Amino acid sequence: MSEIPPEVDLLVLGAGAGGMTAALTAAVLGLRVLLIEKTELVGGTSARAAGSVWVPNSRHSPPGEDSFEKALTYLQQAVGNRLDTDRATAFLHTAPEMVDFLEDNAAVRFRAYPYHPDYLAVLEGATLRGRVLEPVPFDAAVLGPRFRDLRPPLPEFMLFGGMMVDRTDIGHLMGATRKISSFRHAIRLLARYGTDRLRHRRGARLVMGNALVGRLYHSLLQRNVPVLLSTQVTSITLDDGRVTGAIVKRGAATSEIRARAGIVLATGGFSRHPDLRRRLLPASLDESSPVVESATADGFHLAERVGGHLAEHDSNSFWAPVSRRRRADGSMAVFPHFVLDRGKPGALAIDPAGRRFVNEATSYHLFGEALFATLSTFPQGTCHLICDDTFIEKYGLGMVRPRRMNLRAAIGDGYVVTAKTLDDLARRLHVPADALSGTVARHNRFAETGKDEEFGKGEDAYQRHLGDPAHGPNPCIGPIAKPPLYALGIHPGDIGASAGLACDASARVRDTNGAPIDGLYACGNDMESIMAGRYPGPGITLGPAMTFGFIAARHAHRTLRRGKGEAGGSS
């Protein structure tokens, strides 16, 4: 579509998972929708993410194992008195409905991980499985030429320059020389990828976040929902206190569009806005973020001009340990260490004094918090992940693949430091040799007994899930013994905003007095997270993003159907 219509029912800003869910829901409900994306690609940070969606008590949960009450208890335990009970209740009630609605009316398909504990597995209300959904792999060839509109994942999460793999695929690839079933799976993957590259710039079999946004985008195209790329809203229009439309800029042209039911803000949050980063995030944080570069607080600025305001937390973002490496084109790769290395047996995280500072198998958010605490003591220092040759052969390390596939290049460009002895490694890392030797010796004793006497690594279900089930006595603790030894620098990285626009349970943006602004909604990282800076499980950003996008669209539909500006009720 090349022209901006003069009027729609609902205008959605931002084509990530939250925005596309809002647009798709509105279209299914019969509204005239326009989806605007300021970049030339759809998907946002969702396209780079793992694609996990935290939805308790959905149709994919094992029967009888979960409930609204159990999930609410868990959130109350995990978030504490910071929990916005009204919005949390709306999320828990509506998230299963959102899944049903999308699967019944669109090309969106989910499946539950067979086993995936909540991150704070020892808390009351936590579950071992059923809450974490992932998108079913998607064949993007059905998009035809519109496949080019889809934002690719981070290059470091693809093999051979363009093949996406999920955890199941990785297991088969690593076991291809030991199991005939894994060998066959690997051959199918490679054959499919080779065929795809004859037609496309990358593999068309999409998994994780790319599969999720691919399915949402395909569903929008199937319903002929107009999606305008490289288009930006510069201001929101008001009439008697109600949002009525926006001024839209596309190329050199500017026009006004009326939005009868309102506007949904889903522009990605503030993670790439320099001034807000300095104001809201720790001073020790640099620009290490895998969030898309377009997340520059557009929704915040638009909302603030019409009365909205930012709600802050003691932790205004979500964290992960990241490593950095300069790409061949000069750009900086930022690799989040989520699940593939740090929780496996034989990885140690050390501070600039050569000592452990964290349970390596804890959640990536808590690991990030530990990095900040450590760097407050060593403001000019660098923390490292270290391992031995056995580890890197079996599990890889950061951007280094298992089997040492690209190890030589990583050593050559300085991403990985290697040494034959602990003393030599200490010298190369500028840490005290006696401290490092003592740290490794203690951890090697823990590997023998299976009990981490310092941090309790491997003592809950989530941590053991990150480990290697074939390793004992503790799946998360292994010795560092076989040279050469390896290390890479790790830093705290932000993976998405927690602070956001204050909203009510219907996803309506609130003004500074707490009243909803008629016709203005927010979801995703534009909305203040219901988790208030805590990270209870995988998918706690995408799950609420999609759910509140669904809530916003449904509320807008009901408002318009009533034919008046005041909804007067919940979603």
Where are these regions (language model features)?
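Extreme N-terminal leader/targeting segments of oxidoreductases
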Residues: 1-10, 28, 210, 214, ...
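Internal hydrophobic alpha-helix adjacent to the cofactor/substrate pocket in enzyme cavities
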Residues: 302-309, 437, 544-564
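Conserved N-terminal/central alpha/beta ligand/cofactor-binding core
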Residues: 38-226, 346-349, 356, 362, ...
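Beta1/beta-strand and adjacent pyrophosphate-binding region of the FAD-binding site
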Residues: 4-18, 34
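A glycine-rich dinucleotide-binding beta-alpha-beta segment and adjacent secondary-structure elements
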Residues: 235-243, 435-530, 534
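A conserved beta-strand/loop element that lines the FAD pocket in flavoprotein oxidoreductases
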Residues: 220-234, 313
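Glycine-rich loop(s) and the adjacent beta-strand/alpha-helix scaffold that form part
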Residues: 203-210, 222, 250-328, 507, ...
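An anion/pyrophosphate-binding glycine-rich loop and adjacent beta-alpha core
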Residues: 121, 127-129, 134-184, 300-302, ...
